[in-house]
UniProtKB/Swiss-Prot annotation:
Its EC number is 3.5.1.18. Binds 2 Zn(2+) or Co(2+) ions per subunit. InterPro entries: Bact_exopeptidase_dim_dom (IPR036264), DapE_proteobac (IPR005941), Peptidase_M20 (IPR002933), Peptidase_M20_dimer (IPR011650), Peptidase_M20A (IPR050072). It comes from Variovorax paradoxus (strain S110). This is Succinyl-diaminopimelate desuccinylase. GO terms for molecular function: acetylornithine deacetylase activity; cobalt ion binding; succinyl-diaminopimelate desuccinylase activity; zinc ion binding. Catalyzes the hydrolysis of N-succinyl-L,L-diaminopimelic acid (SDAP), forming succinate and LL-2,6-diaminopimelate (DAP), an intermediate involved in the bacterial biosynthesis of lysine and meso-diaminopimelic acid, an essential component of bacterial cell walls. The gene is dapE.
Length: 391
């Protein structure tokens, strides 16, 4: 059994459902300490939702110019769902047909294990590197995300810590490890629209005000804008901005009562061609044009970010090609990740991890061979970035 697989199984066996780290960071910290890393645990959150974060850093000796590479990830996992629906216990690492099964097998305990072992092997071959190496781990990525990576990033920014490169171990591959990496992500912004009406008997509509009827034309216009790609056209790196309704609540459940209010939840996934302010302005303009009596609350989950081809992207692409022969695809598709927080303090951020087909599912799994492939890609990236410093 490879050292990467062994460590991955150790981590998978820990039931670290958000926000519980379940000792994962202690296992990793002990290995990093032996490599000369300085460890800092940053806890955050209320007593009933205590989050554990780890910042581990190894700085080179001497005064030669250095650059900092951070491996970022999370030790928490999503809930298992009904355990009885799993073929094997979700927190008992199990091998079947060349695959490793368990919660976190893809998202993202194998990535974290590959991070650590790649560093161990890199330092064994290059004991005094010019690179500053760091790991940022949290137990609050799969949850609200307010006491995890963002807390560490804010602390690093406050102390003036410089981060040049960051690799986030999110599962990004589609069919084979390395076939896709994320060099950016769309922004996310949610709205909660409360439409005010007057409740009444359905037989006496003149004595009531139906909020569903009132908002329907405005929603139809917003849907039409979205269907026509009318928010923006996107660009070479980003798909056009998308708007979707996620929930619509109205009524008492009775069939003879006009509801007194309606609540609609919606979300934008937006490109760099739009801003939160521009999208908010357009939505409000539509609502105002239809005379909708409403209250609208906005939540910005993250701004779009993009790492254009440069030192980090080139190093990762070359590492993937050397290890797998794949010409990797750069993408900004999909949901959000903690990379949105890191991008505020680091200009070059990419996400690179295993195949994502089974993440968050019953019987989550990864091809065993892919684990070593990922570790080797990380190590080759380290080697290339180190070589760029000494040229």
């Amino acid at each position: 059994m490879s050292r990467t697989l062994q460590l991955a199984e150790q981590l998978i066996s820990r039931p670290s459902v958000t926000p519980d780290d379940a000792g994962c960071q202690q296992i990793l910290g002990e290995r990093l300490a032996r490599l000369g890393f300085t460890l800092e645990t940053i806890e955050s959150g209320p007593a009933d939702f205590r989050v554990t974060n780890l910042w581990a850093v190894r700085r080179p000796a001497g005064t030669a110019p250095t650059k900092t590479l951070v491996f970022a990830g999370h030790t928490d996992v999503v809930p298992t769902g009904p355990v009885e629906q799993w073929t094997s216990h979700p927190f008992t690492p199990t091998h079947r047909g060349g695959k490793l099964y368990g919660r976190g097998a893809c998202d993202m305990k194998t990535s974290v294990a590959a991070f650590v072992v790649s560093i161990e092997e890199f330092l064994a071959a290059t004991p005094d590197p010019r690179l500053t190496l760091a790991l940022l781990l949290t137990s609050d990525e799969e949850g609200p995300g307010v006491d995890g990576t963002v807390i560490v990033c804010n602390a690093l920014a406050a102390r003036g810590e410089t981060i040049d490169y960051c690799i986030v171990g999110e599962p990004t591959a589609v069919e084979r490890c390395g076939d896709m990496i994320k060099n950016g992500r769309r922004g996310t912004m949610s709205g909660k629209l409360t439409v005010h009406g007057v409740q009444g008997h359905i037989a006496y509509p003149h004595l009531a005000k139906n909020p569903v009827h009132a908002v329907a034309p405005a929603l139809a216009e917003l849907v039409a804008i979205n269907a026509a790609g009318g928010w923006d056209a996107g660009n070479a790196y980003f798909q056009p901005t998308s708007w979707q309704i996620s929930n619509f609540h109205a009524g008492t459940g009775a069939s003879n009562v006009i509801p007194g209010s309606a609540v609609i939840d919606f979300n934008f996934r937006f490109s760099t061609e739009s801003t939160p302010e521009s999208l908010q302005k357009r939505v409000h303009a539509v609502l105002d044009a239809h005379g909708v009596d409403c209250t609208l609350a906005w939540t910005i989950g993250g701004l779009p970010f993009l790492t254009t081809p440069g030192e980090l992207v080139s190093a990762v692409q070359a590492a993937i090609a050397d290890e797998t022969g794949i010409a990797t695809e750069l993408s900004t598709s999909g949901g959000t990740s903690d990379a949105r927080f890191i991008a505020k303090i680091c200009k070059q951020v990419v996400e690179l991890g295993p195949v994502n087909a089974s993440i968050h599912k019953i019987d989550e799994h990864i091809d065993v061979a892919e684990i070593e492939t990922l570790k080797n890609i990380y190590k080759r990236t380290l080697e290339r970035l180190e070589a760029s410093l000494i040229q």
